[in-house]
């Protein structure tokens, strides 16, 4: 169940008149999960002002760009942990400064630390005899 929802978008995207620009922002975020993306960078990408981008992005996705980006990063980190990556590798690959930074955000989103998530996977995964 956790895996099924790990890659689901955090909120439904409702295309509107700015849909190509919002899609471009989301695609850019997905391609740069390990980077520190600024609102100015996204505004330049779309040709919109920072404030207009904030308004249309939030109207389309339900979240401001930074929160949406953090959700994307956390879903990727969760997938990596599920696939067997270490917490340090997941943190580095998803742009978190260190394991502690990932831990705070991960726990805030799912209510458990990455270590507890991994431990739960170990308890629920079928054991393969050697």
Question: How would you name each of these model-derived features?
Answer:
Residues 1-30, 40-41, 52:
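An amphipathic alpha-helical interaction segment
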Residues 27, 31, 35-40, 48, ...:
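Terminal helix-turn-helix DNA-binding modules in bacterial transcription factors
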Residues 53, 57, 101-102, 106:
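Short hydrophobic/aromatic patch on the recognition helix
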Residues 113:
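Nucleic acid-binding interface residues in structured DNA/RNA-binding domains
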